């Protein structure tokens, strides 16, 4: 696994879960002897929705909702076999989407 890099992207709606999962990944990678870069916070995507409250009249009566998607990036430089094994066995929170790419 020399001269390789593992890039892990985490996405989720709750930033506390993402930070907790990122800390677990970083701690696991450092414990197995890999060099870690990150966690790097990426821009938060904010989706705003405006909904009419009234079914017929009162155009001014509206509710506004916002959905925030938080993202983090972790690079693992020079991973060892033990690092890959430990990351495969790692159990993360259910509200976190994990994308792993080798580069």
Curated annotation (Swiss-Prot):
Oligomer and partners: Part of the 30S ribosomal subunit.
Keyword RNA-binding among UniProt keywords: no
SUPFAM superfamilies according to UniProt: Ribosomal protein S10
Keyword RNA-binding: no
Disulfide cross-links: none
A Pfam family per the record: Ribosomal_S10
Gene Ontology BP terms: translation
Family: Belongs to the universal ribosomal protein uS10 family.
GO cellular component terms attached to this protein's record: ribonucleoprotein complex; ribosome
Name the record gives this protein: Small ribosomal subunit protein uS10
Function field: Involved in the binding of tRNA to the ribosomes.
Domain of life according to the entry: Bacteria
Gene Ontology MF term list: structural constituent of ribosome; tRNA binding
Organism the protein comes from: Shewanella baltica (strain OS155 / ATCC BAA-1091)
Keywords for this protein: Ribonucleoprotein, Ribosomal protein
HAMAP family, per the entry: Ribosomal_uS10
């Amino acid at each position: 696994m020399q001269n390789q890099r593992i890039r892990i992207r985490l996405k989720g709606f709750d930033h506390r879960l993402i930070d907790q999962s990122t800390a677990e990944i970083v701690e696991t990678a450092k414990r197995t002897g890999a060099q870690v870069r990150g966690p790097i916070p990426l821009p938060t995507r904010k989706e705003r929705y405006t909904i009419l409250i009234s079914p017929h009249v009162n155009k001014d009566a509206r509710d506004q909702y916002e959905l925030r998607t938080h993202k983090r990036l972790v690079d693992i430089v020079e991973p060892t076999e033990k690092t890959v094994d430990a990351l495969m066995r790692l159990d993360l929170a259910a509200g976190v989407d994990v994308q792993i790419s080798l580069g």
